[in-house]
Amino acid sequence: MTLNHFYCSIEEEIRDLTIIGGGPTGIFAAFQCGMNNISCRIIESMPQLGGQLAALYPEKHIYDVAGFPEVPAAGLVDTLWKQAERHHPEIILNETVMRYHKRDNGMFEVSVSSGHTYVSRAVLIAAGLGAFTPRKLPQLENIEALEGKSIFYAVKNVADFTGKHVVIVGGGDSALDWSVGLLKSAASVTLVHRMHEFQGHGKTAHEVMEARDAGRLNVMLDTEVMGIDVENEELKAVHVQSKNGKTRTFPADRLLLLIGFKSNIGPLAEWGLEIVDNALVVDSHMKTSVDGLYAAGDIAYYTGKLKIIQTGLSDATMAVRHSLHYIKPGEKIKHTFSSVKMAKEKKKGMQNG
């Protein structure tokens, strides 16, 4: 995805909707703004759009998005952006939203880390899990010099592991996915999990055990990493110990720690909104307790919430739709099918051309 056509905001230029967060939910919200004929801006703290998919898992394959039997994370982000960019949303990158203020006239001011303030008629928070930092193994100390070289917390580039002896730690979806995903390119893969059973998707867990039974993958359950050997700032081996006290050492070039992330919603926690499970409580329209202020995706909490990409896209659709009542008060809200709207726009483009 190229970003060279994005432009910076004029501080007081009013948009209909400010979208906080440029992950899949935020990008799709921008598309929905275009479909509903309202202007928007996305404010994203990272240097690129895509959220965790772009920052942590660009080469991870996703299987549970409707219409995509299988799609790499970066490919999904590109497709979502291609869908949204036709409506020319304004994009603000490398800016963290710090606070908001609702004016007496109902307008929202959103202030960012650089000191700029952006104004809109409504706000949609699509900040995912907020700021996230990888969980580390406390028994591995002073490893900063190895991080990004021999020790990783995500797979951003498969080439980093090609031809290497890889030890993966974890039992969730990411650990299982990459245990299978790296088999074709790595010299060897060893999966170490401290529990007796995996917590990831059952289908992938079955694939992991099949690979183990076929002798393609080494799986160590009820086992923890206890230490590492390093020479000249390069990883050489990983030491593990099982619950029965048995110790083993594996030659290793790469240690991939996939044991989750700590999330922090940061300044949003100080906005006076109701928070449950580190997420903002919303109603059935994705509205918070403040009129005109919405939340969608992983940052939104409601009974029965499922934190997957698919529900985030649905949340965004409902939030944008309901925001029209606040952005265009008194106007009758009409639904236009996407096929009809796109046909009209194509016809208009041909006439203007």
UniProtKB/Swiss-Prot annotation:
EC identifiers of the protein: 1.18.1.2
Enzyme class label: oxidoreductase
Cofactor: FAD
UniProt cross-references to Gene3D superfamilies, sorted A to Z: FAD/NAD(P)-binding domain
Catalytic reactions on record: 2 reduced [2Fe-2S]-[ferredoxin] + NADP(+) + H(+) = 2 oxidized [2Fe-2S]-[ferredoxin] + NADPH
Keywords recorded for this protein, A-Z: FAD, Flavoprotein, NADP, Oxidoreductase
GO molecular function, one term: ferredoxin-NADP+ reductase activity
Annotated residues for binding of FAD: T25, E44, Q52, Y57, V97, F132, D298, S339
Domain of life: Bacteria
The family this protein is said to belong to: Belongs to the ferredoxin--NADP reductase type 2 family.
Assembly: Homodimer.
The protein's name in its UniProt record: Ferredoxin--NADP reductase
Lineage of producing organism: Bacteria, Pseudomonadati, Chlorobiota, Chlorobiia, Chlorobiales
